[in-house]
Amino acid sequence: MAIRQLPEILINQIAAGEVVERPASVVKELVENALDAGATRVDIELEEGGVRLIRIRDNGGGITPDELPLAVSRHATSKIASLDDLETVATLGFRGEALPSIASVSRFTLTSRRHDAEHGSALEIDGGRLGEVVPRAHAPGTTVEVRELFFNVPARRKFLRAERTELGHIEEWLRSLALARPDVELRVSHNGKPSRRYKPGDLYSDARLGETLGDDFARQALRVDHSGAGLRLHGWVAQPHYSRASTDQQYLYVNGRSVRERSVAHAVKMAYGDVLFHGRQPAYVLFLELDPARVDVNVHPAKHEVRFREARLIHDFVYRTLQDALAHTRAGATPNSIGGDGTGYTAATSGGMGGIASGGVPGNGGASIGSGGAYSYASWTPSQTPLGLRVDEARAAYSALYAPPPSSAQQSAGMPNMAGTGLPATAQDSGVPPLGYAIAQLHGIYILAENAEGLIVVDMHAAHERIGYERLKHAHDSIGLHAQPLLVPMTLAVGEREADTAEREAETLATLGFEITRAGPQSLHVRSIPALLANAEPEALLRDVLSDLREHGQSRRIASARDELLSTMACHGAVRANRRLTVPEMNALLRDMEATERSGQCNHGRPTWARFTLSDIDRWFLRGR
């Protein structure tokens, strides 16, 4: 068969197969062009889910009449002119493929007017066949009209979904855009009826967050803002108990571009690994900013993917930033107050963790609560270390700290003496700690406490389990991982890539407790394994570690296996249900929760406490109505 040059129309239709997957792809490309043109308002009109009509109108810079034919030519763009421009591209579009690809599979009209022009101009294209440029009345800016998408490619059109499904894909992409560009007003109509409007506001505003993802997400979101190594990560991460069954609320932006990137997604998953319930997905809106020269956006025509030049560094930066942010969420803290001033999380002061006598979990000293942000409250600043459940030792200290002397009026009225219970006169006093003071125990399972806002309910086993778990981790982190030599070295058959990874990452593997030498092209000698995991399956564990190191540059398999073991130990050592606690014991547990990282969730990701405000309780009883 002879080799022949394909006609231009067929070339564009082939290119459209990569760029134009469905109506949402058309909306994405056209709106991104509008934003690159400096638009501050974009109107999107749709009919039949975008299959019959997509009309995008903007107030951007516009196009001159003589450039209209060039705008719909392949690889014609105003955004790059050289290889250097491509390697540092900062605009959303740059390939010059979108307009000709869309025009080749639709009935396409491009109308535009520069702000300094007297009138606009229009160009019509029918299935790739170019018309003439004609004058047309038009406001400053550009309108792109796409009718009958895939009318000339029936094989593509029959794979489109129902109208509601296609509209849903468009709305989801617009939500993603609205989060990244709150400074732009977006108006959407469908079948002649207004369906959505995003009002312009401040960059990365909480208002746009609530408008886009809902007030529940906004209330449970922690603001993150951290910089280092020429990188900046900012945005919001939802608290672990606001988890999802799917990944529908995971948004990542690299230099303002919405992307999917596996190493960052892996880093986020690792950061949540210790606090998320099994099978649940975290919710987040994260913006990663870095020098455009350090990221390659020219990976796929649809520009959904990027490639980092320092993927290992970025993975570690994202993981540590989010791990620290989630670690500093303690029970009783208000989500949006992390960081206090809204600029990001603040680390609590470091220190050891107090022991839990009743659970048999070892401890090594005391810990202090951070002095700034969410964890500073009026006058409640005790200087002693957080108390465990050694009630005999704690009772005198609690009585002195929290119990005011009873008044003569109380004594004469026969009121109980509060000095022996460790309770304050009222939880409305200034200086009440976040989880308040215990008032009762419910069915031997839950602690009921009163704080300044209302009622706190604590699952005592789950809370005690997390406290013990964090203390065990602190103790093991301080001594590091010990390697246990094998009496007889184990020979492990691996693939050549795995053997190369093991040889290259020998030092990293040594820090994880593995001593490994290469025995051949596809075999390894394992001379030592992590002592703590001696009873695990070292062969399967090592294969998983090598896979992580090859793909992500690091691995938490050993730490995860260790944490799973420590979690089991903490669970067995935690106070059990139906054990009756005294009020000082309950107060000691509340104080330890406030001083313990990640104490809002148990080791399995379940919440350890809940808050019911006084206004919530008033509504239950219809008070004030």
Swiss-Prot record:
PROSITE patterns: DNA_MISMATCH_REPAIR_1
GO molecular function: ATP binding; ATP hydrolysis activity; ATP-dependent DNA damage sensor activity; mismatched DNA binding
GO cellular component, one term: mismatch repair complex
Superkingdom assignment: Bacteria
Keyword DNA damage included in the entry's annotation: yes
One of the GO biological process terms: mismatch repair
Keyword DNA repair applies: yes
Alphabetical keyword list: DNA damage, DNA repair
Function recorded in the entry: This protein is involved in the repair of mismatches in DNA. It is required for dam-dependent methyl-directed DNA mismatch repair. May act as a 'molecular matchmaker', a protein that promotes the formation of a stable complex between two or more DNA-binding proteins in an ATP-dependent manner without itself being part of a final effector complex.
Family: Belongs to the DNA mismatch repair MutL/HexB family.
PANTHER family (alphabetical): DNA MISMATCH REPAIR PROTEIN MLH, PMS, MUTL (PTHR10073), DNA MISMATCH REPAIR PROTEIN MLH1 (PTHR10073:SF12)
NCBIfam families linked to this entry: mutl, PRK00095.1-2
Identification of the protein by name: DNA mismatch repair protein MutL
Source organism of this protein record: Xanthomonas axonopodis pv. citri (strain 306)
